[in-house]
């Protein structure tokens, strides 16, 4: 799956229960993941499951993330693992239940380790 195919699939999926939005930094990080030969199909499957409210396997380790960004009332930052050292972070809005995907990358890239 190419970068353009990835974003086309996100935009055109009618099976999603919730709307999917992304930031410019997320788009740049997806391009970087593609250049690093990471499988964008894996990322798409995780996002697709989240947007359909499907339960991800325990290997994805979905959890809330504190201290990452400025949370506003009714929203929280969440994180899961696409692969062991490949993270996906998003803002989950409780009132609208819209996921806004913000970043991908390894633990070292994400948290300056």
How should each PLM-predicted stretch be described?
Residues 1-49:
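Arg/Lys-rich, positively charged N-terminal/basic patches that mediate binding to nucleic acids
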Residues 28-30, 70, 109-110:
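A short acidic, often aromatic-flanked loop/helix-cap motif at beta-alpha or helix-coil junctions
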Residues 51-80:
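A short, surface-exposed loop/turn module that caps and links secondary-structure elements
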Residues 4-8, 41, 48, 54, ...:
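Intrinsic-disorder/low-complexity peptide segments enriched for small residues
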Residues 1-14, 75-113:
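Enriched for short, Lys/Arg-rich terminal
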């Amino acid at each position: 799956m190419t970068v353009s195919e990835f974003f086309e699939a996100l935009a055109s999926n009618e099976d999603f229960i919730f709307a999917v939005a992304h930031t410019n930094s997320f788009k740049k990080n997806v391009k970087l993941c593609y250049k690093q030969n990471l499988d964008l199909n894996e990322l798409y499957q995780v996002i697709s499951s989240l947007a359909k409210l499907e339960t991800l396997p325990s290997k994805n380790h979905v959890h809330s993330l504190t201290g990452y960004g400025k949370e506003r009332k009714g929203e929280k930052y969440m994180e899961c693992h696409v692969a062991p050292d490949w993270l996906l972070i998003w803002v989950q809005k409780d009132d609208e239940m819209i996921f806004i995907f913000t970043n991908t990358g390894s633990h070292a890239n994400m948290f300056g380790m």
